[in-house]
Amino acid sequence: MHLTTREFFIDGIKRDRWVWSGDAIQSYLMNYYLFFDSESVKRTIWLLRGKDPVTSHSNTIMDYTFYWFLSVYDYYLYSGDRQFVNQLYPRMQTMMDYVLGRTNKNGMVEGMSGDWVFVDWADGYLDKKGELSFEQVLFCRSLETMALCADLVGDKDGQQKYEKLASALKAKLEPTFWNNQKQAFVHNCVDGRQSDAVTRYANMFSVFFDYLNADKQQAIKQSVLLNDEILKITTPYMRFYELEALC
């Protein structure tokens, strides 16, 4: 952490030396435990947001935009710094407006021109077409985060708006992606049809976000998390979340 902390939290001291939103949110968590360097967290969050008008996702990566939203409320939970949320909230609103302006007819996000739908590096093929279950889970959590932050700053209309959007999206997750035969969320849907692929990403996030009932969480543990036939996670970055789900 010492090596990757400058004015901001950077990734890859020997390689990228760049600020990536997905890596930063994990750096923040390690920092809260090790140093509690709040100023570096705030500077990095501001940097990753950038200026208005919004013209692209954070680092151009769809999932990294969602991690950015989550990182703001994480910071509040650890610091109690409501003033920071007040300062940042207008930028959160315009960032979410950008995301909402790119949803499809189902209210879900898909990769569009200029978007990098990343998810993770993998040793196998990861289809990025259509509605990815992983992206919808992160999107839903981001909307819930917006509602929480709206409440913190006293924006009651915004709170109701984001709660309604989050509830509507959450209600679509299981009907759209859950496959009873596979006992898991499928990786994606293309043109309204579930793919045959099952990956770990949406399944493990839905577990630690508590989006599924206890029976389905246990089903995911057996059919996905402890199943060696499911594409394995190879990066420490995503392994972090897999271990969180197992915990």
Give residue ranges: language-model regions.
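Active-site core of glycosidic bond-cleaving carbohydrate-active enzymes
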Residues: 20-247
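Glycine/proline-enriched, intrinsically flexible loops and inter-domain linkers
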Residues: 13-15
